[in-house]
């Protein structure tokens, strides 16, 4: 019936023939793109990664210390750190292969306009969005896979954001990630909430893999944020409860706590995996090894790849990044 090309006596022989057929395929492109650079372990042990994260997810940590435990030799070329400092982007090697990294920078960062003022990180502001959009396009143009490190609460909101046209910048980022053809890998380090999760190559935008850690909190809206929204008419400008009696105050507090607890329960990473919202739940110490495998797979393309030479991007690209979205 011509449904098979070979007839074999047993499974063992069949497996040997399959191995032989695979050996005849074109070899991996990875050795070529290493360009004589041998894979190296990170400068700091990946086993230390979990110690970088505070127990309370509202407390900050240093994303650059996380990167030092993911890239070869801890070497990372950061692009435009002075522009949109709430976002970190640059290139390092994973297993000897160029890899683009884009991550949120938790903690307070200097306000770009109000001198002496600071604003919270883990939020997408205009300049940061412009920077990572341009960087994402640069990586796509050169065929460099991108790793997104999520610790995102969402987009900036309010009159200032509207005046800056933040919606247009956000649309540009979403369009960029929707049209990229390089493999993108998403790692949910701690929290991934709201439209920021989607814009940073979340699962709906088809990353080749989405990894969650054991403390990841994936949600459309953070529990505390939803509680504030639900009880907004009972709160002042500082989100403190306004009530005439202690009984009323306690009732509002219990209601807010109940909303927050329900959403927090739904944020469980194992539950997200069961719902196929993530591909794998991994320990912090395993992230590096997973990235080695995924990045190697990204360079397994047979034949044509768009990386033309060892350059990372052109001088024009660097000039655009320096403009900071202006």
PLM feature segments, named:
Residues 1-326:
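Ligand-binding clefts of soluble mixed alpha/beta catalytic domains
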């Amino acid at each position: 019936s011509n449904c098979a090309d070979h007839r074999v006596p047993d499974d063992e022989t069949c497996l040997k023939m399959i191995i032989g057929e695979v050996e005849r395929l074109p070899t991996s492109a990875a050795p070529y793109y290493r360009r004589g650079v041998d894979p190296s372990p990170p400068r700091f042990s990946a086993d230390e990664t979990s110690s970088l994260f505070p127990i309370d997810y509202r407390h900050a940590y240093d994303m650059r210390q996380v990167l030092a435990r993911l890239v070869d030799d801890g070497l990372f070329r950061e692009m435009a750190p002075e522009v949109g400092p709430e976002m970190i982007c640059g290139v390092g090697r994973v297993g000897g292969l160029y890899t683009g990294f884009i991550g949120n920078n938790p903690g307070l960062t200097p306000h770009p306009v109000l001198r002496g003022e600071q604003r919270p990180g883990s939020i997408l502001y205009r300049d940061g969005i412009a920077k990572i959009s341009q960087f994402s396009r640069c990586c796509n143009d050169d065929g460099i896979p991108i790793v997104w490190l999520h610790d995102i609460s969402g987009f900036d909101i309010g009159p200032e954001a509207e005046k800056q046209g933040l919606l247009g910048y956000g649309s540009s980022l979403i369009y960029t990630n929707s049209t990229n053809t390089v493999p993108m890998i998403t790692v949910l380090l701690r929290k991934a909430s709201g439209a920021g999760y989607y814009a940073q190559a979340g699962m709906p935008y088809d990353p080749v893999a989405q990894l969650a850690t054991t403390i990841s909190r994936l949600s459309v809206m953070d529990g505390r944020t939803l509680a504030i929204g639900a009880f907004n008419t009972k709160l002042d400008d500082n989100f403190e409860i306004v009530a005439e009696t202690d009984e009323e105050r306690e009732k509002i507090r219990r209601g807010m706590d109940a909303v927050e607890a329900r959403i927090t329960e739904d944020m469980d990473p194992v539950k997200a995996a069961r719902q196929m919202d993530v591909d794998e739940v991994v320990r912090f110490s395993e992230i590096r090894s997973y990235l080695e495998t995924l990045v190697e797979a990204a360079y397994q393309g047979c034949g044509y790849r768009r990386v033309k030479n060892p350059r990372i991007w052109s001088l024009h690209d660097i000039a655009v990044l320096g403009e900071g979205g202006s």
